[in-house]
Amino acid sequence: DRPTSGDLSLAGKNTREMDDRELTNLRLSSIGYIFQKFNLIPLLSAYENVEYPYIMKHRKNDDTGRVRDLLAMMGIDENLSAHKPNELSGGQQQRVAIARALVNDPAILLCDEPTGNLDSQTSLQIMEILADLHRRGRTLVMVTHNPETATYADRIITIRDGQIA
């Protein structure tokens, strides 16, 4: 999608002036997406789900060990990384989704209710992972309805009835 009005600059580039290919490359290199419903590809293993955006950006399989390292950082061992999404718990799926969002080393993470489908203990673990990523220099933009989750934010913007409140 493109802005209906105004300009959007990302990484010093005006996105209005970019063609679809340039926008795709910018998204692959600068933005990681963490979805509420994980959006893992059912036919791929956890490892392959994380590797997929890497292949899209680099046009080759990961030969650096980055996918394996990210999965390990998220607590997904080599045995679990071979499992399909439906064989993983909700918390494990969310960890895989976070690893996938990080695989291309984006500066920005867009997080849509990253703990919305998780129990309280797993939610806390996920928020600690995200807080650590922020401490390491990532920009996180997070949408949440959960007041506890919002306490992790440096800045809170409330939207009520479609307007910034």
For each feature predicted by the language model, list its residue ranges.
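Conserved ABC transporter NBD signature motif
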Residues: G6-N14
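Conserved ABC ATPase "signature" region
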Residues: K13-N14, D62-N79
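Short coil-to-helix segment of the ABC ATPase nucleotide-binding domain corresponding to the Q-loop/switch region
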Residues: L44-E51
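Conserved ABC ATPase signature
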Residues: K84-L88, Q92-Q94
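Hydrophobic anchor residue at the start of the ABC signature
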Residues: I98
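Conserved catalytic motifs of ABC-family nucleotide-binding domains
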Residues: D105
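Catalytic Walker B motif of ABC-type/P-loop ATPase nucleotide-binding domains
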Residues: L109-D112
